[in-house]
Amino acid sequence: MEHRIYNSNYFLDITIPYFFHPEILIRIFRRHIQDIPFLHFLRTLLYKNKCLNILNIENFFYLKKNQFFCFLWNFYIYEFEYLLNDIWEKFYKFESVFFWNFIDKTNSIKKIKHILKKSKKPIEKKIVKKISSIHYIRYKNNLIITLNDRNILILENWKDFFLIFWQKYFNVWFKSSRILIQNFYKNSFSFLGYMFRIESQIILIQIQIINLLRNVNLIKKEFCSIIPVIPLIRLLAKEKFCDVLGRPLCKLSWTTLSDNEIFERFDQIIKHIFSYYSGCINKKGLYQLQYIFRFSCAKTLACKHKSTIRTVWKKYGSNLLTSSIFFNKTKLISLNFSNKNPYKKNFWYLNIIQVNYLAHSLQKSKLLKE
């Protein structure tokens, strides 16, 4: 996707609301389940407590006792994505029908005939224009949709589509402020703890024609993933690793641990951060975070032994937390990669099975702002 997404200049940033009425779930289950007693039982269960009239997923998403409601939320999102995929397939097969006629699958043929007989407006070609590819990314309730089209009018039509989609199918008045049209070149978007944007790079090429030597500027687009250093420093300040300006602090709550446990905790944090943000080309922000953890670890040890940082450097060496097996492995991989390919490129670790804690906190703070 990194090599294809730069074909588009705009993208849709959609935030699905965490709050929804339980009756919506009952209507969704009614489409798939014909067991009426089960539907009555589900309605009774959801309406038993008054505070569940509007479900707040954020409050019980990680609690074991609320696994049933997590299942309902996942089923709710699954229904949304399944129907959206079905509409997209029909939309690209039948160009002679408005896209909102496919929103409700119940008696869709009768409704389409009824609409087409009464509607005398010509079908707009811009609305039914095909697009070569659609990139759909979702994490929880945050959606990023990009189209391989540089016309902003196409995205405005898709924004109207989503507003009608939520209104007709889920009976929800979706706020237009939750669907934002962003420009890749002007606005960088935050997703899963990364900052993404498209940058234009000018490459100078010399062309020699017999006795003439001409310089040609080639503009190359590159999809860049950036480490959000300032938001990460703010999160580290909340965890008491540093202050707001990024100056390392002593982790007082860890001074009761042994030296090996302190080393293991700091080393584990740095290892997870380096693994998660290894896909970024510019590693300057990572080394800044590594500097904060190194000095925070040294200050924690100095506070524990009631000594100075210089004493800690003499005892454990100035390369504190940088001599582990993980960092030697990353240096070896990056060295071999640069020898094979002289150009500056990024590589991803494929053994990441969960989102980093700091990245998850950044994503959560973004959703709370919206």
UniProtKB/Swiss-Prot annotation:
Primary location class:
plastid
Q: Which GO terms describe its cellular component?
A: chloroplast
Q: Supply one GO BP term.
A: mRNA processing
* Top-level taxon in the UniProt lineage: Eukaryota
Q: Which GO-annotated molecular functions does the record name?
A: RNA binding
Q: Which keywords accompany this UniProt record?
A: Chloroplast, mRNA processing, Plastid, RNA-binding, tRNA processing
- Coiled-coil segments, which residues? none
- Pfam families per record: Intron_maturas2, MatK_N
Subcellular localization: Plastid, Chloroplast
Q: What does this protein do?
A: Usually encoded in the trnK tRNA gene intron. Probably assists in splicing its own and other chloroplast group II introns.
**Protein family according to the UniProt entry:** Belongs to the intron maturase 2 family. MatK subfamily.
**Full protein name:** Maturase K
Q: Which organism is it from?
A: Marchantia polymorpha
